[in-house]
């Protein structure tokens, strides 16, 4: 009985985990269907590499690596209307976006948060996908 309860608990946790990593083509498909894409990098990074066309520039971590949560969540509230609405976050290498996505999912209850595999520098650009400056 104990094993059954543990298995059910594990399945429940797995079913409720909504944060996931997506590839470039999935991002394009979701974006074409209206899913917002958010670039959480810094202005310096945006100017160096460009951004994915149609992305919303919403810096989460400043140049010193400190989060700017108040401003970011203010901006997010204008873009994302409820915690069930899907959206995609990305950064340079997927480290910051993964940390943010997991936080949004596990701590704040956002149900459909996605992050771009490899970020813009290790996933998007090497695959030959376009950027805009």
Question: What residue ranges belong to the model's regions?
Answer:
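Structural scaffold elements adjacent to functional motifs in cytosolic proteins
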Residues: 37-39
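Generic cytosolic/nucleocytoplasmic N-terminal low-complexity/intrinsically disordered segments
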Residues: 1-2, 63
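Sec-dependent N-terminal signal peptides
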Residues: 3-13
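Rhodanese-like catalytic fold shared by cysteine-dependent sulfurtransferases
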Residues: 17-33, 43-86, 95-133
